[in-house]
């Protein structure tokens, strides 16, 4: 936080500064006008470019929307065909009843699965019980009295 100390200019320095600003003044005004003109030209060019980009994007977007609408119309037509043929497909499915042969096959598979489950259960249950050792215990077991 330094404190700025104002230094007073001597009359000679003030005169030099005033003459310098007076001599440069008209040049600055012209440069400002030129920059204003160039700036307006640049702004106009930017605005035109932005408008062209926007029109290009909107055109591309319109083409993409049209393609999406066409695809959607095709999908909707296909879905309508499927829905229109649905009653006939259901009728065909009803007429093709499963034969009793298939029923016996499914019953046999179910019985085999149940038998396999019973065998697996008995094996697991047997393995959870420890088998008694054929050897006598190494330590004499005496009841406490």
From Swiss-Prot:
One of the Pfam families matching this protein, by short name: CwsA
Keyword rRNA-binding: no
Transmembrane segments: 104-124
GO cellular component, as recorded: plasma membrane
Localization, UniProt: Cell membrane
Record function comment: Required for regulated cell division, cell wall synthesis and the maintenance of cell shape.
Assembly and oligomerization: Interacts with CrgA and Wag31.
The protein, known as: Cell wall synthesis protein CwsA
UniProt organism field: Mycobacterium tuberculosis (strain ATCC 25618 / H37Rv)
Gene: cwsA
């Amino acid at each position: 936080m330094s404190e700025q100390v104002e230094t007073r200019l001597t009359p000679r320095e003030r005169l030099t500064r005033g003459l310098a600003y007076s001599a440069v003044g008209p040049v600055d005004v012209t440069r400002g006008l030129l920059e204003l003109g160039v700036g307006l030209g640049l702004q106009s060019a930017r605005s035109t470019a932005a408008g062209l980009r926007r029109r290009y994007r909107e055109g591309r977007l319109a083409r993409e929307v049209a393609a999406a609408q066409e695809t959607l119309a095709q999908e909707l037509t296909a879905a309508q065909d499927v829905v229109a043929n649905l009653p006939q497909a259901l009728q065909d499915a009803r007429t093709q009843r499963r034969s009793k042969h298939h029923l016996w096959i499914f019953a046999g598979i179910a019985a085999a699965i149940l038998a396999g489950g019973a065998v697996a259960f008995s094996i697991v249950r047997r393995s959870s019980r420890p088998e008694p050792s054929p050897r006598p215990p190494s330590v004499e077991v005496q009841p406490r009295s």
